[in-house]
Swiss-Prot record:
Bias kind Polar residues: ranges: 393-423, 692-710, 972-982
Residues modified as Asymmetric dimethylarginine: 348
Stretches for region Disordered: 133-154, 360-439, 691-712, 873-1029, 1045-1103
Protein name: Activity-dependent neuroprotector homeobox protein
Name of the encoding gene: Adnp
Broad class of where this protein is predominantly found: nucleus
InterPro entries the record matches: ADNP/ADNP2, ADNP_Znf, HD, Homeodomain-like_sf, Znf_C2H2_type
Source species: Rattus norvegicus
Length: 1103
């Protein structure tokens, strides 16, 4: 199947798979809709079961391997290989499928992007690139079309197959391999050779070679590095590529080879021109590198014989100028033009790239002059070429001649060291004549306008673009772009070299800055609108060598054309504090300690021009070229500081490669220009200077050596170039590392929690085990600790940081899962000195961690709780238990502390203080016993669950009283002075812990039984007891706790005589006499009692 050549095959191939799927879905839906219509024609199951693929076709599709769709254009039919490049595909075919290489390999069509095997390509060329002659017509246009196609009319007998080499970048073709290789040297590697080329006796600009008007000046160029003197420019480029850059493989990869079937060229008659037309311009035999473009028609009086060669957006091609401006069809498919035209008639040639060439005709009898063996013309290409310009020597007796005034052709510089435009002054011979000698200077750079395709000198181009096309001039700043030469720039953010055609898109990714207000834009249209609105009256600075210009057409309508002028970073004109200046010079001397306010010191700036980096400190964000982290601050400060601190390198220029690279701050070794961050890490592992400088392995004498040895000056960090906010922020971050002076802090050695010496030779698991031990000592290591551990243990810093992070996460998960208690004990004696009231949270409990004492207390308390309901137990038994408990707890002053069992409750947040003195405990138990006998309150029936819950001696009625008060919403003062005194006593002596309730019924029962007990407590002491408490000292407290039973019995009898104690306590006030006496009593006993408490700690664990 043959079809017309299609462009944009890459885009079509990407969508082809989706289109096929859509079409298959449509076909499937169609089949489903019409399955009923065709059911009558369907054979029965017998035929379906007994039919095989061999009955239908010659092959079984089930045996064919289903190959995935390949989106790359060059696909091997014998294996799954596919490639985007023809050279890789051809190499694969030659190496793997060499048995039938010539017939099966895909070939490129020399006229379009069609690819096919040899036989199919021949048919393709015959059908599409050799059109039949059109029918004769009387009209002039038909006559012109007929004459244009005369040279392309193939005859079957005249077709020949010719092997040609071609340039894959611009489709330049030639049968000779050397010619194509020289073309590539001359046209596509100027940017590589330019830094090496120098001219004798003249200093070049930006590494370019100044071009003279004499052809012999081409031999004056030489290589800067090795002083090689070539015979030609191509020889010098070849020398640079093969000897210095060593990229000769790139040249070989750019040369392709194919066999093309083309019509045989007809012999041409060579006739001398008329005498009045002897002045003509001789063209070289091989001018295929000239780009076709607009050639303006000029009157015949103008004798300036220069050829217009617009380069951008045009194709590399060659045109043979023949008699009557006849472009004869040759072996490479250049179309021809008819011969019969009137004087002054203009013929437009449709060349590649939509660039018509207008050539005026002055005579019908201008004959072609071609010497034998030298005439060669080349086909047109379809690829765009980079904007480059060339000069060519115009020699006599070479190819063809044109009368003067036919073509205006301004000489254009193809490259900075290309061929020189020479003018011959000899008398023209009959066969071919050259123009008269010209004295015009040929060193002027020319640029082509991308809109009108006209050539202009570089100094007037911007004026033309601004006035003729009403272009708007928009200035911008890109300090991160370093202009290497006219075709290549380097991005300091990404540390990569960028060609001109992709430079603008790359700059828009980082953003262009406004030169007036420091705003950053990622869109040219928005930046132009910003300039029109905000800075319409601002004056632009002068254009420098580092300025890049871009001509853009944004949209149709007003302000369509934009002339963008981007000021970039220039290494020569950079100020002293710039990145490259520090890179090429020695590291700065460590600054002297200064006061904190003066840390932002004035940096001395050279008197060199500042135009190259006018706003060096205005870039808001900087991208590290090694780790791609975003840094805030100016380039030269933030980036240099980040490289020194994070990567331990400083920027420099490689002494051999002359490229921007880095050197180690420890051993001052220089890295190669293609290094990465991993290269630095690998070097630091083996660097001998690491342990002697910043990482602080020599902890004892590190500060003294730093002060004495000037060679270690780069180790000390220089903060004088930093902004003050950065200094303040860094100081806050580093406060935990050192409490000393900020400027001396970087020199302080790192003190590790565990010494890693001796573990560097251990296994990986052993070193990880050491890190786990270190984590148990120091779970939050600083950055410098991690760096020192990495250097000592030969581990990556990322591995160490990840290990610590994983351990911390595991600890957090375990805390959430197991809910461990964190004990935060405090001094009860000091706590008692606090005068104001303290409100402990509901989740805090008080525990006694003396296990032996608490175990005894718990067992005895359970016995007492279970015997509460038995009437045969006497009060004396209870008091004996009390004395045994006080003796068993380790001292006469210790109150009873018990651990409450953690039972799930419905209301876990109600605070229940669980610690009271033993005397109050026994009196409350007696009150509870009397309440059970009386009829004031309902009888409380203790179940087994209640018995289990109340096996703590600390479950007192005082606690329950507080719970009832908080639950009912009443203030503590409403319960009367007695309960207030007891609660104050507990607050001053004990900690709290949340109590738990088994259910609501038990809670209400405790509440009902707690009120009368709490209200009877304050009256159990008489006046004698109160006087004892007031005058008691540390030694007298024991007597209070060991009072005889008669005193407690009298107190209980007095309590029984109280009529309706609940009403009395509700009517009483906090300022009663008994309350004051009880306060004084607690003040006397609290200090000695707290001094004897051991093991009382605060737990954050909730029940």
């Amino acid at each position: 199947m043959f079809q017309l050549p299609v462009n944009n095959l890459g885009s079509l191939r990407k969508a082809r798979k989706t289109v096929k799927k859509i079409l298959s879905d449509i076909g499937l839906e169609y089949c489903k809709e019409h399955i009923e219509d065709f059911k009558q024609f369907e054979p029965n199951d017998f035929y379906l079961k007994n039919t095989t693929w061999e009955d239908v076709g010659l092959w079984d599709p089930s045996l064919t391997k289903n190959q995935d769709y390949r989106t790359k254009p060059f696909c091997c039919s014998a294996c799954p290989f596919s490639s985007k490049f023809f050279s890789a595909y051809k190499s694969h075919f030659r190496n793997v499928h060499s048995e039938d290489f010539e017939n099966r390999i895909l070939l490129n069509c020399p006229y379009c992007t069609f690819n096919a095997d040899k036989k199919t390509l021949e048919t393709h060329i015959k059908i599409f690139h050799a059109p039949n002659s059109s029918a004769p017509s009387s009209s002039l246009s038909t006559f012109k079309d007929k004459n244009k196609n005369d040279g392309l009319k193939p005859k079957q007998a005249d077709n020949v197959e010719q092997a040609v080499y071609y340039c894959k970048k611009c489709t330049y073709r030639d049968p000779l391999y050397e010619i194509v290789r020289k073309h590539i040297y001359r046209e596509h590697f100027q940017h590589v050779a330019a830094p090496y080329i120098a001219k004798a006796g003249e200093k070049s600009l930006n590494g370019a070679v100044s071009l003279g008007t004499n052809a012999r000046e081409e031999c004056n160029i030489h290589c800067k590095r090795c002083l090689f003197m070539p015979k030609s420019y191509e020889a010098l480029v070849q020398h640079v590529i093969e000897d210095h850059e060593r990229i000769g493989y790139q040249v070989t990869a750019m040369i392709g080879h194919t066999n093309v079937v083309v019509p045989r060229a007809k012999p041409l008659m060579l006739i001398a021109p008329k005498p009045q037309e002897k002045k003509s311009m001789g063209l070289p035999p091989r001018i295929s590198s000239l780009a076709s473009g607009n050639v303006r028609s000029l009157p015949s009086q103008q004798m300036v014989n220069r050829l217009s060669i617009p380069k951008p957006n045009l194709n590399s091609t060659g045109v043979n100028m023949m008699s009557n401006v006849h472009l004869q069809q040759n072996n490479y498919g250049v179309k021809s033009v008819g011969q019969s035209y009137g004087v002054g008639q203009s013929v437009r040639l449709g060349l590649g790239g939509n660039a018509p060439v207008s050539i005026p005709q002055q005579s019908q009898s201008v004959k072609q002059l071609l010497p034998s063996g030298n005439g060669r013309s080349y086909g047109l290409g379809a690829e765009q070429r980079p904007p480059a310009a060339a000069r060519y020597s115009l020699q006599t007796a070479n190819t063809s001649s044109l009368p003067p005034g036919q073509v205006k052709s301004p000489s254009v510089s193809q490259s900075q060291a290309s061929r020189v435009l020479g003018q011959s002054s000899s008398k023209p011979p009959p066969a071919a004549t050259g123009p008269p000698p010209s004295n015009h200077c040929a060193t002027q750079k020319w640029k082509i306008c991308t809109i009108c395709n006209e050539l202009f000198p570089e100094n007037v181009y911007s004026v033309h673009f601004e006035k003729e096309h009403k272009a708007e001039k928009v200035p911008a700043v890109a300090n991160y772009i370093m202009k290497i030469h006219n075709f290549t720039s380097k991005c300091l953010y990404c540390n990569r070299y960028l060609p001109t055609d992709t430079l603008l898109n790359h700059m828009l990714i980082h953003g262009l800055s406004c030169p007036y207000c420091r705003s950053t834009f990622n869109d040219v249209e928005k930046m132009a609108a910003h300039m029109r609105m905000v800075h319409i009256d601002e004056e632009m600075g002068p254009k420098t060598d580092s300025t890049l210009s871009f001509d853009l057409t944004l949209q149709q309508g007003s302000h369509t054309n934009i002339h963008l002028l981007v000021t970039t970073y220039n290494l020569r004109d950079a100020p002293a504090e710039s990145v490259a200046y520090h890179a090429q010079n020695n590291a700065p001397v460590p600054p002297k300690p200064q006061p904190k306010v003066q840390e932002k010191a004035d940096v001395p700036v050279k008197s060199s021009p500042q135009a190259a980096v006018p706003y060096k400190k205005d870039v808001g964000k900087t991208l590290c070229p090694l780790c791609f982290s975003i840094l805030k601050g100016p380039i030269s400060d933030a980036l240099a500081h980040h490289l020194r601190e994070r990567h331990q390198v400083i920027q420099t220029v490689h002494p051999v490669e002359k490229k921007l690279t880095y050197k180690c701050i420890h051993c001052l070794g220089v890295y190669t220009s293609n290094m990465t961050a991993s290269t630095i890490t690998l070097h630091l592992v083996h660097c001998r200077g690491v342990g002697k400088t910043q990482n602080g392995q020599d902890k004892t004498n590190a500060p003294s050596r730093l002060n004495q040895s000037p060679g270690l000056a780069p180790v000390k960090r220089t903060y004088e170039q930093m902004e003050f906010p950065l200094l303040k922020k860094r100081k806050l971050e580093d406060e935990n590392d050192s409490p000393g002076c900020f400027e001396e802090k970087p020199e302080e050695p790192v003190v590790l929690a565990l010494d890693p010496k001796g573990h560097e030779d251990d296994s990986y698991e052993a070193r990880k085990s050491f890190l786990t031990k270190y984590f148990n000592k120091q779970p939050y290591p600083t950055r410098r600790e991690i760096e020192k551990l990495a250097a000592s243990l030969w581990l990556w810093k990322s591995d160490i940081a990840s290990h610590f992070s994983n351990k911390r996460k595991k600890c957090v998960r375990d805390c959430e899962k197991y809910k461990p208690g964190v004990l935060l004990g405090f001094n009860m004696k000091e706590l008692n000195k606090v005068k104001h009231e303290m409100d402990f949270d509901a989740e805090w409990l008080f525990e006694n961690h003396d296990e032996k004492a608490s175990r005894v207390n718990a067992s005895k308390t359970v016995d007492k709780k279970l015997n509460l309901g038995k009437e045969d137990d006497s009060f004396s038994d209870s008091f004996e238990h009390l004395e045994e408990e006080s003796n068993g707890s380790g001292g006469p002053f210790d109150p009873v502390f018990e651990v409450e069992p953690k039972i799930p409750s419905d209301n876990a947040e109600e605070p229940v203080p669980k610690v009271i003195p033993e005397g109050a405990l026994e009196s409350e138990k007696l009150d509870q016993k009397e309440e059970e006998d009386g009829s004031k309150y309902e009888t409380i029936h203790l179940t087994e669950e209640r018995a289990k819950l109340m096996h703590d001696a600390s479950d007192s009625e005082v606690d329950q009283d507080d719970v009832v008060e908080w639950k009912d919403g009443a203030s503590p003062s409403e319960s009367g002075p007695g309960s207030r005194q007891v609660s104050d006593f507990e607050d001053n002596t004990c900690e709290m812990k949340p109590g738990t309730w088994s259910d609501e019924s038990s809670q209400s029962e405790d509440a009902r039984s707690s009120k009368p007990a709490a209200k009877k407590k304050a009256t159990v002491q008489d006046d004698t007891e109160q006087l004892k408490w007031k005058n008691s000292s540390y030694g007298k407290v024991e007597g209070f706790w060991s009072k005889d039973q008669s005193q407690w019995e009298n107190a209980s009898e007095n309590a029984e005589r109280l009529p309706n104690p609940q009403i009395e306590w509700q009517n009483s006030t906090i300022d009663s006499e008994d309350g004051e006496q009880f306060d004084s009593m607690t003040d006397g006993v609290a200090d000695p009692m707290h001094g004897s408490l051991t093991g009382v700690k605060l737990s954050s664990q909730q029940a």
